[in-house]
Structures are given as C-alpha cells and as structure tokens.
Amino acid sequence: ASDFLMQQGKVNRVLVICPLSIMDSAWRNDLFDFAPHRTVAVAHGEAKKRKSIIEQNTDYVVINYDGVEIVSESIKNGGFDLVIVDEATHYKNAQTRRWKTLNKILRDNTWLWMMTGTPAAQSPVDAYGLAKMVNPTAVPRFGGTFRDMVMTKITNFKWIPKADATNTVHRVLQPAIRFTKDECLDLPSMTYVKRAVELTRQQKKYYEQLKRKLVLEVTGEQVTAVNAAVGMNKLLQISSGAVYTDDGATLEFDIKHRYKVLREVIDESSQKVLVFVPFKHAINILTDRLRKDGISTEIIQGSVSAPARTSIFKQFQEATSPRVLVIQPASAAHGVTLTAANTVVWWSPVSSLETYAQANARVHRSGQKHKCTVVQLQGSDAEKHVYRLLDNRINIHTKITDLYKEILD
C-alpha cells in the first residue's frame, strides 16, 4: 500500500517504527521481497549512526521505538510523510515519553498507519493512546475521562469494562480496517492441548511452604494487585524450576518431570519447536539440559542483540539446526515469522493475554504448511488457573486479586 502511494506521488518517504527484534528479520526482508525496487535502511546503533542513516534519503527507514526518542529531531526534518507503527500497542499510554515524542513528530499532513492485532488486549483503556494519536477528536482530552466512558469502578483497586465498552473502542478507533487471519490466509488448523506435569518432591515442598506463608500474610489484610502479582509470580517460578529469593539469590529445583514431558513433545513433533519460558534463570537451566542431550538449541531473550536475533531467526527458518528455540516471550512475541516450527510449548504461563496470543501466532502465519499445536505444561494449581484465564481470553491483570485468592484457598 505504501509503495502504491509512492507510485501515485502522494508519499515520498516512509518511516517504519517496530520492535527491535523484527527490524531486519521481518521489515527489511519483507520490503526486499515485495518492493525490491525501493531502497531500505535500518536505523540502529549509536545516535550519530542513526542520524546518518536518516539523512541518506532512502525510500524506507526502519527504526525501533526507543530509537525514535534518540533521533526525534532528525526524524522531524527527514521528510517522512508516511509513518507506519507496527505492534502499535506500544503507544497505548498517552502519558509516556515514547507517545509524546512520536506525537510531536507527526504533522497535520502526515499519513499515520498504526498496526496491531490487539488494540485493547489488556483493557478497553488501552485504545485511548492509539485513538488520540490517529484521530484526537474521537476521544476526550484526558485519559481519565475516557476510562470513565469504558470502565466501571468496583473498588479502589478494581475496574471492570462496561457492557458497551467494545462498541466504544470500535468507534473511537475509526478510521480503521480489520482483517481476520482466516480472511487473509488459508492456514492449517491450530490445536491447543494440555500436558499434566508432576511437580518434584522438592518443588511441592517449597510450593506448599510458600502458599502457607502467603496465606498468613493476607489473613486479615486487603489483597492488592501488587502483592497478588508478586505472590503468584513466586508460585509460578517454583513451578517452572527456579525462584528468585528475597535477597536476590536464585534457588533451583529439579525439573526432571517437566523436562521429560517436554522431551516427549519435542520427539513427537514432525517439525521444529518453540519453547516459551517467562523466567530468565529457568531459560538457562532448560537450555543446558537440551544441549546436554544433543538437541540443537538457541536462546532468544532480552540480552541477545538485534543482529544476533536476526541471525538466529534466519538460521532457524532456513537451516536444519537449531531444532529448538527457547524464548523469553516478550523478546519474540511480535512480528517474527517462525514457521519452520509447528509446535509451541509453554514451559510456564505468562500473565499477558496479548503476549500469549502473539507468541502463538509466530508459527500460525503465512508460510505455515503443517498443522500447529500449542502445548501448555501444567504442574501446579497456579499454572492451571492462569492457563484457564488465557484460554477464556480473560485479562489476567483485571482478575489478579481474585485469581490470587483462588490459588491460596
């Protein structure tokens, strides 16, 4: 569409803002495939280098969210008349510096396309920042007023969506075009399955000890969303194989039962496998075990540089090795195509419905030729409760205190 507008003389230059992890692997590669006659540059690195790239006058410049803040003045003067924001939910909060920086860059005659599959994944309030940027007249001046339009206050700490919240969100996000995956792609089916995992004796011991401690802490006290999230996170960490103690140390657990089930899933899979692991230390434990067993494995997490991620993704898609990617969900939940795999395993659940859905979509997208399976490893009641909410597409953050009480009962 952007290339068409260029051909029509309506657009001269395009700025693409996207996650760091997909600047090369998705955007540069896709532009090369679909618009090989256009010039493309990726603005990444030190500020001086980014500025130099922007000044080169290529047709497309691809930059990550934080990079926009670093070279905002250069972007203002860069002659961009179309701005494309991929995974636009990163701009849902109009109070952030990130949002304000981009808003200042946009001129009245700037084309703006904000792309997301989940415009209000966590709450109807998430739509406010997107709407205020695309069509400011569609929403009130203040976010609190919009929140009152779409949410009802139940307690000091709890808000729930109003019955007509979805209609309100749809209205304020116009103009918009929506395509479902089924409308765009003829994809093989996707199946969700649960695999029961027995906690080891050591895990059970510490899990029950922590539950008793948490029950004592909340007895007679009001449970807040903050302490509920902290407590639940500790229970999930124990279930996954490593828990961070109050003094910053890490306590590791035997993961033999969970690992055995994972190996069964890997052995059963006809293609490659993605394993999503929310906790960093558990990533290291699991990866060591897989490599020790001779399974070629690479890690994708926050500490892996953008060039290294691009190289790993390319190798995963095109070569026989690695067979398994162990991924911290937030590091590769958006934009990346990983269709060399047809099996997704959740070593432990995440609390974000958006991250969960987007991560699963890494395999179920254009180019997939095989039936896909999402496997949830469930060992503790905390994990089962979280997966239940994810399966029912319920925003966990709005239910965190209720969920916490259920787990402790």
Language-model features and meaning:
Residues 1-18, 186-336, 401-409:
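Conserved Helicase C-terminal RecA-like lobe
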Residues 68-74, 121-124, 283-287, 309-313, ...:
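SF2 helicase motor core recognition
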Residues 351-409:
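A conserved SF2-helicase RecA2
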Residues 16, 62-63, 84, 111-117, ...:
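Structural recognition of the conserved hydrophobic beta-strand(s) that form the central parallel beta-sheet
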Residues 22-46, 136-137:
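Conserved helix-turn-beta segment of the N-terminal RecA-like "Helicase ATP-binding" lobe
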Residues 11-13, 28, 37, 82, ...:
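Conserved P-loop NTPase motor "coupling/switch" region that bridges the ATPase
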Residues 21, 41-50, 64-70, 92-96, ...:
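Conserved helicase motor
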Residues 54-58, 71-81, 105-107:
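Short basic/glycine-enriched coil/helix segment immediately N-terminal to the Walker B
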